[in-house]
Each structure stands twice: as C-alpha cells, then as structure tokens.
Amino acid sequence: MAFHKLVKNSAYYSRFQTKYKRRREGKTDYYARKRLITQAKNKYNAPKYRLVVRFTNRDIILQIVSSEITGDKVFASAYSHELKAYGIEHGLTNWAAAYATGLLLARRVLKKLGLDETFKGVEEADGEYKLTEAAETDDGERRPFKAFLDVGLARTSTGARVFGAMKGASDGGIFIPHSENRFPGYDMESEELDAETLKKYIFGGHVAEYMETLADDDEERYKSQFNRYIEDDLEADGLEDLYAEAHAAIREDPFKKAESEAPKKTKEEWKAESLKYKKSKLTREQRAAGVQERIAALRSE
C-alpha cells in the first residue's frame, strides 16, 4: 500500500472536528461511558446508576452516580479516609480498604433508601462469589438496588483494587452484575475461585504476610515502611480482627463521623486561611517607606 502524506491545507482545517474536551485531556473513555449511561427506552424515567471507583495516592473515592442531560448526579459517596471513624487508621488505599469503603457506600445507599433491613448482603465475609438477589417482603418480591461498575481509565487486571471496592459494595447489599474471574484467587486453568485467597485479601491477610516477611528479612526496612503501624502497636496478627470489627461497625452505623474530626470551617475562615499565605500588593506609600528604611540602613553602616 502506498504511503500518503497528510496534507494539512485549508480544506483539512475547515473540516477538522475536535474531540470532546475530556477526551483531549485523557480523562474520559467515551466508548465505555456511552454504554454505561444509555438506559433502555422502555424504562422511561428510571435512572441508570453507576458505581464509580477512583483511586488517588492517599484516598479511595466511591460514588453512586446517575447521568442526566444537565450532568451527572451523585446519589451517595464514601471515601477511604472515613474509615478512620471505624478504627482503620492505616493502609487506606490497599485492597482491604477498598472492600471496606465499598461496604460503607452500600450500607449508606440502602440506609438512605430505607432498604438496609431488607438487603443485608453478606454479613460475615467468607470470600465466596455471591450476587444480591430479590428479597421477599410483606408487599411481595422486592428487587435490590442495581448499579453498574464504572472503573474509568483504570486497568481491569485480575485482582485489581477496583474489584475489591465492587466486592465490598456487592457484599453490602447492592446488586452489581459481575463474574468471579477478576477476583484474587481465581484460577484461569481450572476456572474456579479460591474463596480462602479472596477472604485473605478482604481481611488484609496479604498485608499481614508481607509485614511478617519483611520483619524477618529486613527489620530496618520494616520499621521504615510500617512505622505508623508500630507507633499504634498494630501487628500483623491483629489486622484480621481490626477489619472484622470495622465491617461490623460500618453495618451498625454507616454515617459515623471520626471523633477527632473538627467542626467544618466557615467560608470566612477558609478565606482568612488562604489570605495568610497570599502576599498582598504594597501601596505606593508602603513602597516609598520601604525604600527610605533601606536608605537609612545603608547610611548607618
């Protein structure tokens, strides 16, 4: 096939069509988004909810979002830094924290809808693959709250943390259509899920194993990497109980606030805080006074 050089003439520029801004910035996969937000036309005004999972360097952000013409509407949200209220102070971006944050979001959503007693999900995490099913009520069969996983631009590798967040939300009582083949412990050859491996990840067992290995092999690095764990007297064998207690506390009160959390600052307080670091422009009189001070200092020398 012959090579055709791209000629950027006036016709090229007059017919050029720019991509969406968030595509140009590399923030949104519109191919996936189109399929996630398109609702069946026979469902009329029923919103289609997405479980949006995003990771930052120090936090995990989970939201239940529906799309409207005017923009996306957030129905509920949960952040991994909120886990401090439930006793999880460290490792707020690992697999176990992702699961706990997913569980927190699910319980919040169902509490908000008044469905927390109808759909309890998996009360004691066992690592088994299970989808939330319809529940029998006094008024007949009640279908569960349904959401679709939205991973954004994250890689969907087997064992990725996004699936930890999804598993937590699923065990919390939300119906999220998924299969078991992306969870840690899934064997591609036998096509079976090892529930014990998945359970280990849910309760931070993989972190505990690494802590023990590092403590034996390189104590100096262990003290450096797990410095805050050591300060709080948190050892490898105590992680499972810590996460189990946190899961129970989340189910008991999904809207709990951390005790150390200070009251929110007002708009005026934030403004004063920002002005503290902003260098204000000097007036003409102040500049002249400064010049005179420097002249006086030089003369005194």
Swiss-Prot record:
SUPFAM superfamilies associated with the record: Translational machinery components
GO molecular function: 5S rRNA binding; structural constituent of ribosome
UniProt cross-references to InterPro entries, sorted A to Z: Rbsml_uL18_euk, Ribosomal_uL18_C_euk
GO cellular component, one term: cytosolic large ribosomal subunit
Gene3D superfamilies registered for this protein in UniProt: 3.30.420.100
CDD domains on file: Ribosomal_L18_L5e (cd00432)
Short name of any one Pfam family annotated for the protein: Ribosomal_L5e
Main subcellular location: cytoplasm
Protein keywords: Cytoplasm, Ribonucleoprotein, Ribosomal protein, RNA-binding, rRNA-binding
Location in or out of the cell: Cytoplasm
Biological process according to GO: ribosomal large subunit assembly; translation
PANTHER family: LARGE RIBOSOMAL SUBUNIT PROTEIN UL18, RIBOSOMAL PROTEIN L5-RELATED
HAMAP family: Ribosomal_uL18_A
Family per record: Belongs to the universal ribosomal protein uL18 family.
Subunit comment: Component of the large ribosomal subunit (LSU). Mature N.crassa ribosomes consist of a small (40S) and a large (60S) subunit. The 40S small subunit contains 1 molecule of ribosomal RNA (18S rRNA) and at least 32 different proteins. The large 60S subunit contains 3 rRNA molecules (26S, 5.8S and 5S rRNA) and at least 42 different proteins.
Protein name: Large ribosomal subunit protein uL18
Organism: Neurospora crassa (strain ATCC 24698 / 74-OR23-1A / CBS 708.71 / DSM 1257 / FGSC 987)
Lineage: Eukaryota, Fungi, Dikarya, Ascomycota, Pezizomycotina
